[in-house]
């Protein structure tokens, strides 16, 4: 596929993403070489927590949880979701080359979430999708 830097992840608790609750196994392709290792939330200064409250019921529930996670005043579940988002967005930031380490990627994702920029982008995306729905009708 031509990718130059990729992280394939699978958590010990069965998620196909980086887990807030357990160790995550990683196969990282970088500079033509694959390295396998594991990571935990504590390695990036995030406290490991259960996934209780993060199970999504439907798209409306998902949107509400994301708004809570990205908002200025977060509930306890919103805090947990924000950490889960930072863990996974941090990987994307790292493999995109914006940072030189996964830990730096998570820190940048955390700053973007807590600085309000992530919620601003979500609002822009939400408004854009509303305009698309007008064309479907």
Go through each PLM region and give its residues.
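Glycine-rich anion-binding loops and their surrounding alpha/beta cores
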Residues: 1-137
């Amino acid at each position: 596929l031509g990718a130059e830097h990729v992280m394939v992840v699978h958590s010990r608790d069965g998620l196909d993403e980086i887990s807030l609750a357990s160790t995550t196994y990683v196969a990282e392709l970088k500079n033509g070489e694959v390295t396998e290792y594991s990571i935990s939330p504590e390695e990036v200064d995030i406290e490991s927590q259960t996934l209780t409250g993060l199970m999504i019921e439907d798209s409306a529930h998902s949107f509400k949880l994301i708004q809570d996670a990205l908002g200025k005043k977060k509930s306890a579940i919103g805090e947990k979701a924000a950490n889960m988002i930072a863990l996974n967005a941090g990987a994307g930031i790292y493999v995109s080359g914006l940072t030189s380490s996964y830990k730096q990627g998570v820190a940048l994702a955390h700053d973007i979430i807590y600085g309000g920029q992530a919620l601003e982008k979500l609002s822009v995306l939400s408004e854009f999708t509303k305009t698309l729905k007008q064309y479907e009708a």
